[in-house]
């Protein structure tokens, strides 16, 4: 299918993937490539426009230089943060270290231009933005004009209207920049003239064709967790190759309450997919005994999954592929997407936890999609709402929600506490009648392997602590902690302490992402 495309060159920002998400929200196809993508490949890609991402480095570092031939292609270019500095530096301007690092909220005063026209909210010629930079442009290249400034950054926005080159010293892709989406839409749709053709039905058509081409007549095994990602991956792959797909549902003893039965019933009823149920609790618990480091736990769980899949593969004559529900945020948190340029935060079970000697080839049909796109895809594939809009659940399961060593005792306590929390979220609504489960993007309980003193009845208790975590996010790259009603939190706490023997204290996590990640490990 021929469609207009935007190219994003990644200089290493942790939020570069959000640029791609915002472009796709405008229904325009885009791809993210490393900053050092060869010019001939850029020409072959034939983009309608180019976006240069932010990054943690200086324009004077020779290792982070794109081919400046991009400025001779006759297409619009938007430089974001480092991308703006790169543009200014290579087109004859000057970039110098700032007197002070600018990080966080700022207001940019603007003048009307092609980039800023009709994007304001309440205050004309004012943008509410998120800054994150040290260096700044101190002298404009020839042909450029200042179109925005802040008190500490006199050149916060610049443009060359004739060549359609634009630079902005803030991040329009993050939700903290209120008019960011409108600004990116202005660039992509109006300045670049890209026609919106990126939709989930189109994606299904292309993905199905790609899966069939990759797999051929081979059989595929998919690790089914019951979460959104693996469920949608199963539906998409099943749409492409039917009974060549066998889902392996591994009960590693780290699932949510009654999840095994629910997942088996759901897939038999809704998808008609072949599912093998493997009870491997003893195998996983034995390997995890005494292990406290979260990275080691992830890698052990990943390795044990592969052992299980290898055992099942021997029963399937043509099995050559291991399918996973890996999505964009998984990849960027492990190493910075396809470009491998962003600073690693932690390994993801679907990405960094697999052994090098894995016998099966990987099939990851969702790895270029964000979570909300995955949900859209699930609906387009005809999956039921309760499956598609279920909160995410990590591949390692409760193994990364039990801090430190994993024990069956801890998992049993956590399962009960988590189920109570989710029940109350589903049963409590806001003033508009929407459940707090639907209002939050992800919610769960975390087991803390420490004991605290309590009093129940006339006696002293010395039992474990659980933390409740609930966040609101549109993309899982950044997140706000959910401001749940005190009455709801109190009810959850009372039920857990009274109904789960072994827990006597409940706390609520009020950390955002960043600085914290959504999961505790």
Curated annotation (Swiss-Prot):
Q: What is its EC number?
A: 6.3.5.2
Extract the CDD domains matched here. Answer: GATase1_GMP_Synthase, GMP_synthase_C
- Highest taxon of the lineage: Bacteria
Please give the coiled-coil regions recorded for this protein: none
What SUPFAM superfamilies has UniProt attached to this entry?
A: Adenine nucleotide alpha hydrolases-like, Class I glutamine amidotransferase-like, GMP synthetase C-terminal dimerisation domain
From the UniProt record, list the reaction(s) this protein catalyses: XMP + L-glutamine + ATP + H2O = GMP + L-glutamate + AMP + diphosphate + 2 H(+)
Q: Which GO terms describe its cellular component?
A: cytosol
Listed binding positions for ATP are: 225-231
Q: Could you confirm whether the keyword ATP-binding appears in this record?
A: yes
* Pathway info: Purine metabolism; GMP biosynthesis; GMP from XMP (L-Gln route): step 1/1
Give the GO molecular function terms: ATP binding; GMP synthase activity
Give the positions the UniProt entry annotates as the active site: 81, 171, 173
Leading EC class: ligase
Q: Where would I find the Glutamine amidotransferase type-1 domain in this sequence?
A: 5-197
| Keywords assigned by UniProt, alphabetized | ATP-binding, Glutamine amidotransferase, GMP biosynthesis, Ligase, Nucleotide-binding, Purine biosynthesis
GMPS ATP-PPase domain: which residues? Answer: 198-390
What binding partners and quaternary form does the record give? Homodimer.
- What does the UniProt function comment say about this protein? Catalyzes the synthesis of GMP from XMP.
Q: What is this protein called?
A: GMP synthase [glutamine-hydrolyzing]
């Amino acid at each position: 299918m021929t469609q207009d495309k935007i190219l994003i060159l990644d200089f290493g920002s942790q939020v570069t993937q959000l640029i791609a998400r915002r472009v796709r929200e405008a229904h325009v196809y885009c791809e993210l490539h490393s900053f050092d993508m060869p010019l001939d490949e850029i020409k072959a890609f034939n983009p309608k426009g180019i976006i240069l991402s932010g990054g943690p480095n200086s324009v004077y570092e020779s290792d982070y230089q794109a081919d400046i031939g991009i400025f001779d292609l006759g297409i619009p270019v938007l430089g974001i943060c480092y991308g703006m500095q790169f543009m200014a530096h290579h087109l004859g301007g000057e970039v110098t270290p700032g007197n002070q690092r600018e990080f966080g909220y700022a207001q940019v005063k603007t003048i009307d231009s092609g980039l800023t026209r009709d994007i304001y909210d309440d205050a004309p010629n004012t943008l509410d933005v998120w800054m994150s930079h040290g260096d700044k442009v101190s002298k404009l290249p020839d042909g450029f004009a200042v179109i925005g400034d802040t008190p500490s950054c006199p050149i916060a926005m610049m443009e060359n209207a004739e060549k359609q080159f634009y630079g902005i010293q803030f991040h329009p892709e993050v939700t903290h920049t209120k008019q960011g989406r409108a600004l990116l839409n202005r660039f992509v749709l109006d300045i670049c003239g890209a026609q919106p053709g990126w939709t989930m039905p189109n994606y299904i058509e292309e993905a199905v064709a790609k899966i069939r081409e990759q797999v051929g007549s081979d059989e595929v095994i998919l690790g089914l967790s019951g979460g959104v990602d693996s469920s949608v991956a199963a539906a998409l792959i099943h749409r492409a190759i039917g009974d060549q797909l066998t889902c392996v549902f591994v009960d590693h003893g780290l699932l949510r309450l009654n999840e095994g039965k629910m997942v088996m019933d759901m897939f038999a009823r809704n998808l008609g997919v072949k599912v093998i149920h493997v009870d491997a609790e003893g195998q996983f618990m034995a390997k995890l005994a005494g292990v406290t480091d979260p990275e080691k736990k992830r890698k052990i769980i990943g390795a044990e999954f592969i052992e299980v899949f290898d055992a099942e593969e021997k029963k399937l004559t043509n099995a050559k592929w291991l399918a996973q529900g890996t999505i964009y945020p998984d990849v960027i948190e492990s190493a910075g997407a396809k470009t491998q340029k962003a600073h690693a935060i932690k390994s993801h079970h679907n990405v960094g936890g697999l052994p090098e000697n894995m016998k099966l080839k990987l099939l990851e049909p969702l790895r270029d999609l964000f979570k909300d796109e995955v949900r859209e895809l699930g609906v387009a594939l005809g999956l039921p709402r309760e499956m598609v809009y279920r909160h995410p659940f990590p591949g390692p399961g409760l193994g990364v929600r039990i801090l430190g060593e994993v024990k069956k005792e801890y998992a049993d306590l956590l399962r009960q506490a988590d189920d109570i929390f989710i029940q109350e979220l589903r049963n409590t609504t806001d003033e508009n009648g929407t459940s707090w489960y639907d209002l939050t993007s992800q919610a769960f309980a975390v087991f803390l392997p420490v004991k605290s003193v309590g009093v129940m009845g006339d006696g002293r208790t010395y039992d474990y602590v659980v933390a409740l975590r609930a966040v609101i996010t549109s993309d899982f790259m950044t997140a706000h902690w959910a401001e749940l009603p005190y009455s709801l939190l109190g009810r959850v706490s009372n039920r857990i302490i009274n109904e789960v023997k072994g827990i006597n204290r409940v706390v609520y996590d009020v950390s955002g992402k960043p600085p914290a990640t959504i999961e505790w490990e």
